[in-house]
Amino acid sequence: MKLRIRTMIWAAVLAVCLAGCSATGISGGTSDAGQVTTDFLEDTVFTVADMRVSLAEWYLYALPQAAEIENMYGTEIWDYPTDSTGQTMADALKEDIREQITYIKITGARAAELGLSLGEDDLFDINLQTEEYMSSLSEEQRLKYGITEDAVRQIYSDNVLAMKVYENLTLNIDTSIPDEQVRHMVLEYIMILKDYEDEDGEFVRYSDSELDSMRSDAEALLEQVLADSSITRLDEINDDRYSVVELVADLAELKEKLPGEIPEIAFSMRQDEITGVYETDDALFILDCVERTDETTTDKARIEIIEARQQALFEKKYGEWENEAVIKYNYKLWDSLGVR
């Protein structure tokens, strides 16, 4: 899948395939607390291996995210404590941004060893998006935060390379998935409960004779449905005694919502099959397989499973890279750094 660079820089950082990685507890490599701040250029926030993160780059990540949070919660949110240690919302976002940048830097740095680089189309898109982004900023914004075309271009380039690395490493992931794990069906069913609620709110079991009558009525209804060619779905039955429930689910979800052997029976039904009457301890069931395979939900589930496999594979590899990375902070700048 070709990455479409977003006009909002931070959205590219959180692109679907790379989203959530900072939330998994990535520590951002090995911190070198003994680094002397005079070793840094004045506007360097920190370095990841030999890669420098400038103040302008920091703000390009931070400002859009801070603005979105303020739009949602107001400007007072920054002093709000997020945990028992006294960490504030501003502290939490600062750490999250550091993790985002570190993640992109470490990942993109592996492009060369994998034989990956920016192609002509990538460079064209990067330059175009850089121009568009720069044109959206006022001169005051550029000067206040030191934002330059080079800084913007660097972020777009880093993100494209990181995406290329991700796709390269996860391209050949196993995509075979057992039917029972991924297939979603559309099931309609009538559930006839064996209990009723009395005036005191207590559930009372129907008498044996009443249950026999309910079974006979359900069997007669099923016979009527199967004999009437104009009825193709349970919800086409005109009988006020029964309500029809529709459920779109895989086998695991069927097991969560339906009792006994009903899930396995339903999941094995043929397309358009109406069958019953099945009995559990608490109810009678008539089942209708409206769609044996619901393509939309099945495809969505398949994609989610494959993406989870890709993410797990990539995070394992990233963990190895992270252990090799050394992060050095310009504490003179870092300690006073905000997100606005």
Please give the residue ranges for each predicted region.
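Peptidyl-prolyl cis-trans isomerase
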Residues: 22-43, 50-53, 81-340
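Bacterial N-terminal signal peptides that target proteins for export
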Residues: 2-9
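Short, compositionally stereotyped local motifs that mark structural "simplifiers"
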Residues: 11-15
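C-terminal motif of bacterial Sec signal peptides marking the signal peptidase cleavage site
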Residues: 16-20
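Mixed-charge, low-complexity intrinsically disordered segments
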Residues: 68-84
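Surface-exposed, interaction-prone regions with an acidic/low-complexity signature
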Residues: 44-47, 67
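Short, solvent-exposed beta-strand-terminating loops
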Residues: 55-72
